[in-house]
From Swiss-Prot:
Localization of this protein: Cytoplasm
Function: Specifically catalyzes the AdoMet-dependent 2'-O-ribose methylation of cytidine at position 56 in tRNAs.
Source organism (scientific name): Methanocella arvoryzae (strain DSM 22066 / NBRC 105507 / MRE50)
EC number(s) reported in the record: 2.1.1.206
Oligomeric and partner information: Homodimer.
Presence of keyword Cytoplasm: yes
Superkingdom, natural source: Archaea
Gene Ontology biological-process entries: tRNA nucleoside ribose methylation
The keyword Cytoplasm is assigned to this record: yes
Enzyme class: transferase
Name recorded for this polypeptide: tRNA (cytidine(56)-2'-O)-methyltransferase
Length: 178
């Protein structure tokens, strides 16, 4: 079990749809297997799954989950939990330890939206900051996932998509697979 799953806490449909969609797309692009939403927002789930269908991969989204139940089940299966928060240990101070855990275990990464429930800090195995300053949760997730996987996340190949980018130094090249 070396999967990466995102748990998005407190998504507010009227306010956070775009950011939550970008959290999911960033996670997908950097190698996560799926995303759990504590809010039952089907439109965000459908939007992300449309992108996955078009561009490939097996990324999934489940909405309306209980964070306590998901964390408990994840840990029972042998995984560990990282909560991204500006109040945690700065990433350079705990990265090696987390990478060592990740060698044999899956990681659930908690990304908050609104005020994070206080029990999250105790449920997480690691409370990790990316800089101990307020900034974007999307940036924190991207930096954390890249560092966790030592840059290998950028080499992931997405199979089964309708579209594929052909890398080009100048211009744009996209091919249709169907």
């Amino acid at each position: 079990m070396q999967d990466i799953v995102i748990l998005r806490l407190g998504h507010r449909p009227e306010r956070d749809a775009r950011v939550t969609t970008h959290v999911g797309l960033t996670a997908r692009a950097l190698g996560a297997k799926g995303m759990l939403l504590t809010t039952d927002d089907k439109s965000v789930a459908e939007s992300i799954q449309r992108v996955a269908a078009a561009w490939g991969g097996d990324f999934w989204v489940r909405a309306g989950v209980s964070y306590r139940s998901e964390i408990r089940q994840w840990k029972e299966k042998g995984g560990f939990v990282v909560h991204l928060t500006m109040y945690g240990i700065n990433l350079p101070g705990c990265l090696e330890q987390i990478q060592e855990q990740f060698k044999g275990r899956g990681v659930m990464i908690i990304v908050g939206a609104e005020k994070v429930p206080g029990d999250i800090y105790g449920l997480a195995d690691y409370n990790v900051a990316v800089g101990n300053q307020p900034h974007s949760e999307i940036a924190a997730l991207a930096l954390f996932m890249d560092k966790l996987q030592e840059g290998k996340s950028l080499m992931h190949e997405f199979k089964g998509g309708e579209l594929k980018i052909i890398p080009s130094e100048h211009g744009k090249s996209v091919v249709k697979n169907r």
